[in-house]
Amino acid sequence: MNTLVNAPAMPKSVLYLDGVSVSFDGFRALNSLSLFVEPGEMRAIIGPNGAGKTTMMDVITGKTRPDQGEVVFDDRVDLTRLSEAEIAELGIGRKFQKPTVFESHTVADNVRLALSGERTTWSALFGSRDRITDGEIDIVLERVRLSAHRERLAGDLSHGQKQWLEIAMLLAQDPKLLLVDEPVAGMTDAETEDTARLLRDIAQTHSVVVVEHDMAFVRALDVKVTCLHEGSVISEGSIDAVSADERVVEVYLGR
């Protein structure tokens, strides 16, 4: 099966959605959605509940098939033809809002289990590797501020630390694109600040798409913002420009 497409006549992209529509029982979750993310870019996605943010992530990862439109990764791979596992193997990792970690195992073993190569939920979502060394684990845990908790049980971590551990489980696979869903939901203020710094650090070496409701956190990310409403993009630009957009104020931020 040929999954390659002709690259669009525009600058190179890591993720390109064009005219993507998805309907569920007559409800249009995505309505001709178009999005362009450059390599090495971190993009924040905001919007009210039901705007299509989760469906967009589901389409990118292969969980949901679009009714129409293009979904292209790395300028040439048609994601609509691939399974979730195949998309993960390409280098797209997703972190859901609720952290999914192995609570009865240590922090370090969580990273090992995520990359065990067994056909588990984790390996299907995030791909697999034959082995990961202790040194590689140390590097990843240091990056997510969990070095001091290497031998702690994951179940003993705070909510924020569990979120960071799941990010570590993604980073160990070295994905090209990370999709991060509401990473600071339920976090303390200090954890939220640390998470903003963490994602800015990750964005130095990876492309990142962050879905988030916390506007203070989005501002701290200091990146281009896309606002969705009823399955379409209604505003895009800096956080200041998007926050001042009357359409965004009306449907999302309130007056």
Task: Spell out what each predicted region is.
Residues 2-255:
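Glycine-rich phosphate-binding loops of nucleotide-dependent enzymes
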